[in-house]
């Protein structure tokens, strides 16, 4: 998965806004549904399911309870327009898929995960993974080719207001986006926390009356927030220092663009 922030910017949605969370929720619900249907089709064709399928919640049907109670009701007109012409499964569709999987099985035990996609996103001219961009124009130091500069994908006067740096966004909003996807993903996601060493004034209410310096307490509060919301993993914590350095970035020596 990559390009989510680019999708938001090109459709003039702010990262972490209610409509961006709604889009993420529905998009990954669709991804879940259609990968389940594809895995069920393969299981039928090959007459084989993953090991211990009969002991899984897919077989008992418990897995589908969250999808079979109500139909999707769009809250945002913009999100509704984005999905116009795309088949959004109804609760009846989910019930039919639930029955088909109970009868014929699933070929894949694991289907979905979100990788960091740091380098590959540049090649594809889109934003990395599900997280926000870090700069409007990003500088990368490649060991073999020297410095390379990458503007935010589809950067224009229209998209610029929606390309806010990850370091200037409340990390709870980033977690909200990831959790909206996590509901539909059976494995973990490369959820990265982007923190300034000097936190923006007023961003986190628990800092009121305290130093704005980032501390381990701040990280613990955010980790607990992510856990309570249902995130399965946190990948990295990247820190932007007062010297304009990034610490903790996933710099792979063997990866070049």
Show where each model-derived region lies.
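Core structural elements
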Residues: 1-12, 184
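Glycine-centered flexibility motif
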Residues: 3, 47-49, 69, 129, ...
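Catalytic phosphate/nucleotide-handling subdomain of diverse soluble enzymes
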Residues: 7-11, 15-38, 125-150
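Internal maturation/activation junctions in enzymes
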Residues: 13-117, 189-190
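Catalytic alpha/beta core of large soluble enzyme barrels
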Residues: 64, 80-92, 99-246, 251-257
